[in-house]
């Protein structure tokens, strides 16, 4: 008896084109920028204020989710189908943690069909003290 083996054909895998999704999330707005790997060319830039009507809705997680969906669609149309995510908060004098829209934007990017690589927090944190804007002796009223 002869056993005829069928040659297995390799599955065609889609070539991944990587980009970087920069998510800046503060207590006032969420801005999502998708660039190429070098960061030189901006592929898509959408903010929470571009997808909502009222200013009070800009920092909401819903606005961040809609902005992330829109940015992902623009990136997929330009050929980028995989991203590394870099999340940033205000830092410096502001909050050292990202705002309320950061996690919602990450979830939306994952659900939109983009392949997620690394997720990194790049909030600028001072390692010494920073002088307050009011100066050395404080604000005199």
Swiss-Prot record:
Q: Name one GO molecular function term.
A: structural constituent of ribosome
Question: Could you name the Gene Ontology cellular component terms for this entry?
Answer: ribonucleoprotein complex; ribosome
Q: Which UniProt keywords apply?
A: Ribonucleoprotein, Ribosomal protein, RNA-binding, rRNA-binding
Where are the annotated coiled coils located?
none
Q: Which GO terms describe its biological process?
A: translation
SUPFAM superfamilies referenced in this protein's UniProt entry, alphabetically: Translational machinery components
Name one matching Pfam family: Ribosomal_S11
Asked if the record carries the keyword Iron-sulfur, the reply is no
Q: Which InterPro entries match?
A: Ribosomal_uS11, Ribosomal_uS11_archaeal, Ribosomal_uS11_CS, Ribosomal_uS11_sf
Please give the function described in this protein's UniProt entry: Located on the platform of the 30S subunit.
- The protein's assembly and partners: Part of the 30S ribosomal subunit.
Query: Which family does the entry's similarity section mention?
Result: Belongs to the universal ribosomal protein uS11 family.
Protein name as catalogued: Small ribosomal subunit protein uS11
Encoding gene, per UniProt annotation? rps11
